[in-house]
Design a protein with these regions (language model features):
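Axial heme c-ligation environment in periplasmic c-type cytochrome domains
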Residues: 48-56, 70-116, 152-158, 175-201, ...
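Gram-negative bacterial Sec-dependent N-terminal signal peptides
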Residues: 1-21
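Sequence context surrounding c-type heme c attachment/ligation sites in exported
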Residues: 28-35, 129-141, 160-169, 196
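Predominantly soluble domains enriched in secretory-pathway, periplasmic, or organellar proteins
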Residues: 64, 108, 123-130, 141, ...
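Surface-exposed interaction/gating patches
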Residues: 113-154, 160
Length: 210
């Protein structure tokens, strides 16, 4: 818990020192470069297959960060960045401007809405908004916001309306350490305390959070 609090303190200090960062991606160029992406993420950025993430409406800075780290995962043999058998290979031929253009394009689109099953609303809302102090689990809303919109400056992703199946898989990867490109291991430190049921409830809850 102390590690998470320290990470947030460092992050907030860095953000206060700089009001914003210029993002020089080109939306039109990104649209032209996105044809290959559409196979998995959909022509409008809303992945038709739920194991792939929706990219529409995601923060450009976050998309750019993930693309650079996916490429780093491949070039380092998984020692750095984020390693994914499919996406790391797809990111390999992209140069820096390609990544910025793609990020700008997908962030300009609208993410499709999802729904939250009634049977997880109460438990999901409690865990997301308040966490679980007894187990040392902080509120998800502390970083991702009360509506799950995240933060562009902090590079915390928008997680509301995301496919539950994708959220579930990423929380499991953070928990078991197969994904480790989170700031100071914050997501691993949180996910390792989540049960399978917690992850299932949160994933479904986020599907319709707005």
């Amino acid at each position: 818990m102390k590690k998470i609090a320290l990470s947030l303190t460092i992050l907030l200090g860095a953000l206060s020192a700089s009001n914003a960062t210029a993002f020089d991606g080109d939306v039109n160029a990104g649209k032209e470069k996105s044809a290959t992406c559409a196979a998995c993420h959909g022509p409008d950025g809303n992945a038709p297959v739920n194991i792939y993430p929706k990219l529409a409406g995601q923060h450009a800075d976050y998309i750019y960060k993930q693309l650079t780290e996916l490429k780093s995962g491949m070039t380092s043999g998984g020692k750095e960045g984020r390693m994914d058998p499919v996406m790391s290979a797809m990111a390999m031929p992209l140069n820096d401007q390609d990544m910025k253009d793609l990020a700008a394009y997908f962030s300009s689109l609208n993410m499709s809405e999802g729904a939250t099953p009634k049977d997880v609303v109460d438990v999901g809302a409690m865990l997301y908004k308040a966490g679980d102090a007894e187990r040392g689990i902080p509120a998800c809303a502390a970083c991702h916001g009360p509506r799950g919109n995240g933060s562009s400056l902090a590079k915390f992703p928008k997680i509301s309306f995301q496919h539950p199946e994708y959220i579930k898989s990423q929380l499991e990867k953070f928990r078991d350490g197969t994904r480790h490109n989170d700031l100071n291991g914050m997501m691993h430190d949180i996910a390792i305390k989540l049960t399978d049921k917690d992850i299932e409830v949160l994933s479904k809850y986020l599907g319709g959070l707005h």
